[in-house]
C-alpha cells in the first residue's frame, strides 16, 4: 500500500486558495500512484480565523463535494484532514474519509480540543472513534491534540487498526513533541502512523512546524518532511506489522487486569 501526505501551505480564512492548493498538490502527488492521500488539519481555512462562524462550511458541503470529486477523479482514497463544519447549532473539527469511488466511508470529530488556544470555546468535541477499511486494510484517524492522549490510540490498536492517520496543525515551538509522540504511538501500538502537518502559520502568526512523517511499527521514519510545503510518499509493507507482533507480542503480554 502506498501513502502520500500533502503538507499543504494553509492560508488563513482563504478557502478558495486552499482548495486550489489541494488540487495542485494532489495532481502532483498522483505521479507516484498512491493508494491513499492524506491532508492536514483545517486545511480549508487554517487554525483558525475569527469570527469562526464567518468561515465555517455548512454541513461540510464544500469539502465533501470537492473531496468526493477528487477521490473519484483520481481513483484514490482520501483521508481529508479536517475542516470546520457547521452542523445545526454547533461547529465540529471534522475529518471526512472518501474511498476511490468518491463515497464517504467515515467521519471523525476531533475528540480532544486544545484549550490553551480556546478551541474548546468554538468547537464541539467529538463523541466517537473512527475505524474503517481501505483496500481491505483496517485504518483509524485522530486529529492533532489527540496525539497527547495515548489511550485513544491504544483503543484503536485493540480495534486492530493497522494504519492510524493524524491530520494536524502543530506549531514549530513544540515540534519535537510532535516527532517524539508520533514515533511513540507507532512503536507502542505496533501500527503504521501517518502524521500530517501543514506549512505556513496559524491565525495568530505562530508558524506551523511541518515535519510530516510516515512511520512504521518499528519507529522507522519511512518519509519525513522539513517545515516547507511538501509531498511525501512511502510504500508500507503490512507484513512488517505481523513480524513485530511475532517478535514482541505486547498485546499478549499486557496486564489488562491491572490497568
Residue positions per predicted region:
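CN hydrolase (nitrilase-like) catalytic-core segments centered on the catalytic cysteine
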Residues: 60-79, 148-232
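A conserved C-terminal secondary-structure "cap"
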Residues: 242-259
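Hydrophobic residues at beta-strand termini and immediately following loops
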Residues: 6, 108, 132, 196, ...
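Short beta-strand scaffold segments in enzyme catalytic cores
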Residues: 80-82, 94-97, 130, 212-214, ...
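Active-site catalytic loop in hydrolytic enzyme cores
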Residues: 86-159, 172-180, 245-250
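Cys-nucleophile CN-hydrolase/nitrilase-fold catalytic domain and related Cys-dependent amidase chemistry
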Residues: 15-101, 107, 171-191
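Short beta->alpha transition motifs characteristic of CBS
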Residues: 45, 52, 96, 108-114, ...
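Active-site-proximal beta-strand elements of phosphoester/diester hydrolases
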Residues: 1-14, 38, 94, 107, ...
Amino acid at each position: 500500500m502506498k501513502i502520500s501526505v500533502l503538507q499543504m501551505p494553509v492560508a488563513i480564512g482563504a478557502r478558495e486558495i486552499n482548495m486550489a492548493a489541494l488540487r495542485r498538490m494532489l495532481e502532483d502527488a498522483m505521479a507516484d500512484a498512491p493508494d491513499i492521500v492524506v491532508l492536514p488539519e483545517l486545511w480549508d481555512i487554517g487554525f483558525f480565523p475569527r469570527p469562526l462562524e464567518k468561515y465555517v462550511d455548512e454541513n461540510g458541503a464544500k469539502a465533501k463535494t470537492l473531496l468526493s470529486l477528487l477521490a473519484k477523479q483520481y481513483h484514490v482514497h482520501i483521508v481529508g484532514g479536517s475542516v470546520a463544519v457547521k452542523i445545526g447549532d454547533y461547529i465540529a473539527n471534522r475529518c471526512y474519509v472518501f474511498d476511490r469511488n468518491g463515497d464517504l466511508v467515515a467521519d471523525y470529530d476531533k475528540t480532544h480540543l486544545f484549550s490553551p488556544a480556546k478551541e474548546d470555546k468554538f468547537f464541539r468535541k467529538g463523541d466517537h472513534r473512527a475505524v474503517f477499511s481501505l483496500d481491505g486494510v483496517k485504518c483509524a484517524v485522530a486529529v492533532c491534540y489527540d496525539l497527547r492522549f495515548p489511550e485513544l490510540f491504544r483503543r484503536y490498536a485493540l480495534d486492530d487498526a493497522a494504519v492510524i492517520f493524524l491530520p494536524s496543525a502543530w506549531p514549530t515551538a513544540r515540534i519535537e513533541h510532535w516527532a517524539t509522540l508520533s514515533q511513540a504511538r507507532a512503536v507502542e501500538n505496533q501500527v503504521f502512523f501517518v502524521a500530517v502537518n501543514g506549512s505556513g502559520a496559524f491565525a495568530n502568526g505562530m508558524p506551523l512546524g511541518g515535519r510530516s512523517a510516515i512511520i512504521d511499527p518499528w519507529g522507522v521514519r519511512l518519509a519525513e518532511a522539513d517545515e516547507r510545503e511538501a509531498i511525501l510518499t512511502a510504500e508500507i509493507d503490512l507484513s512488517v506489522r505481523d513480524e513485530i507482533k511475532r517478535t514482541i507480542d505486547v498485546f499478549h503480554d499486557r496486564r489488562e487486569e491491572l490497568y
